[in-house]
């Protein structure tokens, strides 16, 4: 579910950038005094409201915009930009006083862009270059711009225009329907908080955005009940895109964010545990776990899923005497899931923080069994393999039976090797909080929140791109130089009384230097006690990598990560491992000391005589 949420957010950013770039040369537009929102169709997923187009003239000088532009096919970008410029230069639009852009899903896999503007004069004349047709007793006017047909419709002093005639027809239908966006209380409560003096405002309908996302991706993203409307002030800086605003909650608990009502924002500490190469993180912060579970169950009832959940809860009590309603009282202030990006593979995890891990592990004894100890950490198997999912909702992934405990955090995954990988990184202090790409980004985040979604585009963009539909794979391309310095994309939601604050951030770190990329990884069942040593292999003209474990076994690996040999030594290696040409014949051996012997070993693992 975390991946799905991230996939929804990234297209929003890219589409918004395309629209802003397309409009950057248009000048002197004033704020709209007429409420254009009343005629927007119900399938509106995003509204971009431009308040100061003068500031957008310099948008292309921003480094973050240039980097994002490099992810968009140049022909697609230029064609759309030039077409919009041509439309806005038309005499029909010479005196417009507002300009707004909205996105709509039309049909199964079509995205329609609707432009709305206020006219200074209620009377305008469509010249002979416009074709006219009637729809539901209203006139729609059509003309060509750069070989692209645009359709226009005027209602009072508001002009609508789009390349999609279908969305213009939807506007006309809305005029006669009972639907009115400004009567939607979730939108109304958020919209009244926006600042009309901001450079721009962006309003996001998460429900419709979930449907719109199916246009971009092969499979529909099931996040329909994540949230309602979020209305934000948008600011674009040289290295930063920020959208700050609010979304409202519903006491009837209709969306996942509604379950956060009355919860205090909490500090995000899981970053001190999870690996440096975390690509995506979904974190929930709360002060009342019992209330969170109750609200989550109300959401299940709303979606007709509570009966099955409660049936399983009762069966768990009967079989083990473990009760979710009692278990939740032993959970502290954090829960969520995260994903790491590692070579060509990934690891997925769920987690929650306990009040006291000793007390909780004791309570869970009837449904868990210890399977092994790894680097002084116990690894367990939980018979309730959907435990975290059942406690915190469908937004948390299923099937994570393996777990370990780190600093009172219960860390779950779908396989034991992923748990080992987590333990290795934690012991090595190779954690997200210490990573060079996250340190600067972390200063932009609110340290306390009720919900944080974080993604590192440099690590997650490949997966995002693979999931795109074929047509959009061509339009949105992978450019590692452009994406590597974009080190963070996040959404944070926090309780602010009757509303929830929402903060979007996209950050370009001009100073970030990518670490050397791992090409392979080896997992041993024991702990390594030496750093890797690189010695010459004259046969392959490459390097061999030598490491020693706690049993004093020396392992030799090729540069491709294949085990070449291993040898049991009498003691721990003292000092360095070096290369030597013992016979002066350009054939190299490795040389090192233990406390009782000098060792010279050839490339095959044999001692030199």
Regions found by a protein language model. Give the residues of each.
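Hydrophobic beta-strand positions in blades of beta-propellers and related beta-sheet-rich domains
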Residues: 159, 348-350, 410, 554-556, ...
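An internal, short helix-loop-strand segment that often contains or flanks glycine-aspartate motifs
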Residues: 63-98, 131-242, 259, 264-268, ...
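Short, low-complexity Ser/Thr-rich regulatory SLiMs
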Residues: 103-107, 134, 154, 236, ...
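Short, solvent-exposed coil/turn segments at beta-strand boundaries
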Residues: 110, 121, 153-159, 240, ...
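Positively charged n-region of N-terminal signal peptides that target proteins for export
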Residues: 1-8, 526, 535
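Short loop/beta submotifs within extracellular cysteine-rich repeat domains
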Residues: 55-56, 122-125, 167-171, 179-181, ...
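Extracytoplasmic/lumenal domain signature
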Residues: 401, 422-436, 447-449, 453-458, ...
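Structural boundary/hinge residues at secondary-structure and domain interfaces
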Residues: 7-146, 184-223, 242-346, 359-372
């Amino acid at each position: 579910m975390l991946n799905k949420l991230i996939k929804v957010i990234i297209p929003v950013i890219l589409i918004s950038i395309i629209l802003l770039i397309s409009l950057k040369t248009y000048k002197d537009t004033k704020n709209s005094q007429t409420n254009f929102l009343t005629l927007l169709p119900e399938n509106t997923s995003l509204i971009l409201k431009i308040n100061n187009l003068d500031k957008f003239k310099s948008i292309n000088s921003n480094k973050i915009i240039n980097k994002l532009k490099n992810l968009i096919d140049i022909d697609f970008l230029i064609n759309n930009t030039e077409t919009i410029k041509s439309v806005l230069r038309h005499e029909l639009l010479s005196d417009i006083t507002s300009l707004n852009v909205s996105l709509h899903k039309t049909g199964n896999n079509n995205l329609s862009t609707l432009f709305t503007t206020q006219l200074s004069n209620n009377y305008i004349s469509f010249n002979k270059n416009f074709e006219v047709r009637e729809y539901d007793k209203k006139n729609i006017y059509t003309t060509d711009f750069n070989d692209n047909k645009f359709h226009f419709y005027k209602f009072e002093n508001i002009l609508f225009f789009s390349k999609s005639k279908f969305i213009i027809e939807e506007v006309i239908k809305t005029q006669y329907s009972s639907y009115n966006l400004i009567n939607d209380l979730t939108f109304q409560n958020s919209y009244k908080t926006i600042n009309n003096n901001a450079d721009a405002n962006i309003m996001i309908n998460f429900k419709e955005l979930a449907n719109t996302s199916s246009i971009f991706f092969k499979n529909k993203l099931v996040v329909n009940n994540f949230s309602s409307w979020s209305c934000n002030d948008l600011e674009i800086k040289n290295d930063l895109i920020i959208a700050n605003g609010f979304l409202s909650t519903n006491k009837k608990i209709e969306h996942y964010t509604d379950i956060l009502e009355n919860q205090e924002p909490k500090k995000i500490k899981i970053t001190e545990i999870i690996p440096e190469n975390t690509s995506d993180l979904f974190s929930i912060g709360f002060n009342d776990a019992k209330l969170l579970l109750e609200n989550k169950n109300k959401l299940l009832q709303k979606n007709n899923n509570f009966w099955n959940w409660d049936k399983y809860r009762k069966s768990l009590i009967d079989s083990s005497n473990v009760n979710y309603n009692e278990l939740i009282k032993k959970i502290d202030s954090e829960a969520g899931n995260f994903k790491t990006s590692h070579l060509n593979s990934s690891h997925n995890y769920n987690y929650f923080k306990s009040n006291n891990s000793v007390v909780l592990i004791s309570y869970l004894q009837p449904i868990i069994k210890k399977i092994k100890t790894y680097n002084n950490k116990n690894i367990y198997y939980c018979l309730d393999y959907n435990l975290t999912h059942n406690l915190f909702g469908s937004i948390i992934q299923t099937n994570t039976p393996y777990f370990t405990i780190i600093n009172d955090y219960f860390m779950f995954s779908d396989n034991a090797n992923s748990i080992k990988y987590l333990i290795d990184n934690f012991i090595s202090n190779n954690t997200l909080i210490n990573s060079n790409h996250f340190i600067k980004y972390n200063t932009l985040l609110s340290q306390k929140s009720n919900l944080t979604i974080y993604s590192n585009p440099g690590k997650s963009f490949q997966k995002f791109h693979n999931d795109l539909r074929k047509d959009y794979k061509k339009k949105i391309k992978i450019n590692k130089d452009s994406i590597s310095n974009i080190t963070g994309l996040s959404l944070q939601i926090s309780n602010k009384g009757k509303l929830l604050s929402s903060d979007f951030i996209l950050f370009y770190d001009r100073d970030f230097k990518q670490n050397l990329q791992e090409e392979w990884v080896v997992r041993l069942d024991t702990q390594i006690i030496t750093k890797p040593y690189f010695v010459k292999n004259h046969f392959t003209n490459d390097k061999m990598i030598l490491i020693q474990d706690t049993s004093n076994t020396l392992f030799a690996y090729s540069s491709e990560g294949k085990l070449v040999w291993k040898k049991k030594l009498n003691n721990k290696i003292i000092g360095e491992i070096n290369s030597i040409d013992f016979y002066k014949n350009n054939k190299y051996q490795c040389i090192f000391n233990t406390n009782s012997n000098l060792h010279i070993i050839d490339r095959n693992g044999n001692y030199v005589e």
